[in-house]
Structures are given as C-alpha cells and as structure tokens.
A protein has these predicted regions:
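Interfacial helix-loop-helix junctions of multi-pass membrane proteins
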Residues: 43-50, 106-113, 150-171, 216-227
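A small-residue-rich subset of transmembrane alpha-helices
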Residues: 75, 79-112, 161-190
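Generic transmembrane alpha-helix signature in multi-pass membrane proteins
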Residues: 68-78, 126, 137-145, 151-160
Length: 228
C-alpha cells in the first residue's frame, strides 16, 4: 500500500469515526428519552420467585443501554491494560456492593449522573494513548460499579429473599459473561498496531453515548418528569 492509499485509508477511517460519534449521540438521546421502566424486564413489578428474580437480574444490564455500554467499555479496557482483568473484577464486585447498599436503604445521591458519567469517562479513557495505570482504572471501575449496582437495586427493592438473591446472581453472571466475552474477543482482535485505532474508534462511540446519557440525566434533574 503506497502513501496515497494510506492517506485515503486514514481519511476514510476518520470520517467513519466522526459519523459513528454523531450517530451514537443521536441514538443515545433517543434511548435515554425512553421511560425509566425500560430498564425493568417486568415493568414496575417486583419479582416474586427465583426464576423471575434471576431473569430480571440478567435483563437489567442488557436492556439498560447505559449499563450495557459501560460493561462493554470495561471489557475493552480490561483487554488493553496490563492485568486488566482486575478492572472487570472490581466493577462486578462493586456493583454487588452497590445493590446491597440500596437494599440496606443507604442513600447514594446522583446515581443516574454517576452511571452516565462513567460511560463518558471510560469512553474517553479508551481514546487515550497514555492512559492512567491499571490501579487507577480499577479504582474508577469500582466507584462506577457502586453507582451501577445501586441503580440495579431499585428494581428488586422490597422483594422477598429468594427472588432478591436470584436477581443479584443474575446481574452478576451476565456482567461477567459480557465483560469476559468482550475481553476475549478484544484480546484476539485488538493486538499490535490495530489496538490504538480500533480502541480509539470504540472510545469515540462510547464517549458520544456517554455524553448523550449524561445530558439526558442532567436534563431530568433540572426538568424532572412527573410521576404517575
């Protein structure tokens, strides 16, 4: 491939990166306009048995687009950082603690803002060539996990012990599955010279989504929707 072809390739890639960013921002705004019940597999109903609890736990991180985007970013960062597996572990453990804090009626303010900001932050981290060390990112992942877990706890608050434990098991399992799948695929494809440009492209998309999520969360704080 000659120099002219290289320039054409990078220009095309830049255009697609920008289009992906603009598209993700628009998509994020549309998704965040959905009602809060979109994060609940059973709407506003509390699970009453093991199966309902487990399936609700699996569904919440998948149908909550802000949660899924962050879990995806955790898997990507874990793949490109040295000893990055600890980033995933810290998030999963902290999310369980966050859910437990909610169930224990501990008050954590700004949960939606924290969840949205975490997507933006990890998207930005993916775009950086010189990232903070793994220990710092592990700490950030744990803090984010507390916010995400606290948000998960809202769906199961008031449930009996069996569906509650099943719910905790469900969202823990699905988070591990998603992060490990992204981690494994990224380890395979994000290697050598491909790591930086592909990682940056993914980071731009996630940053765009995070920005959209955060803008919507701020708007909901300033102009809260009426309940009922």
């Amino acid at each position: 491939m000659n120099q002219s072809d290289n320039l054409g390739f990078f220009r095309t890639k830049t255009v697609f990166n920008q289009l992906g960013l603009y598209f993700s921002v628009s998509l994020g705004l549309l998704l965040m306009a959905l009602p809060a019940s979109a994060h609940h597999m059973m709407g506003e109903k509390v699970p009453t048995n093991f199966f309902q609890g487990f399936m609700s736990g699996i569904a919440h991180p998948l149908i909550g687009f802000d949660h899924f985007a962050f879990i995806f970013s955790v898997g990507l960062l874990a793949a490109v950082q040295k000893r990055g597996m600890f980033i995933s572990i810290a998030f999963v453990v902290a999310s369980m603690l966050g859910a437990g804090a909610h169930l224990a009626t501990f008050n954590l303010s700004g949960v939606e803002l924290g969840v949205s900001a975490s997507v933006l932050l990890f998207g930005i981290l993916l775009t950086l060539k010189n990232r903070p060390n793994t220990a710092t990112i592990v700490g950030l992942s744990a803090i984010a996990g507390l916010f995400h877990g606290y948000a998960y706890g809202e769906s199961i608050f008031g449930a009996e012990t069996t569906p509650l434990l099943a719910y905790l098991l469900g969202f823990t399992v699905i988070q591990l599955v998603v992060t490990m799948t992204v981690f494994s695929l990224s380890k395979k494809f994000l290697s050598g010279e491909a790591q930086l440009p592909i990682g940056r492209s993914a980071g731009l998309v996630l940053s765009g989504m995070g920005l959209a999520f955060l803008a919507s969360a701020i708007a909901n704080v300033i102009f809260p929707l009426p309940k009922g």
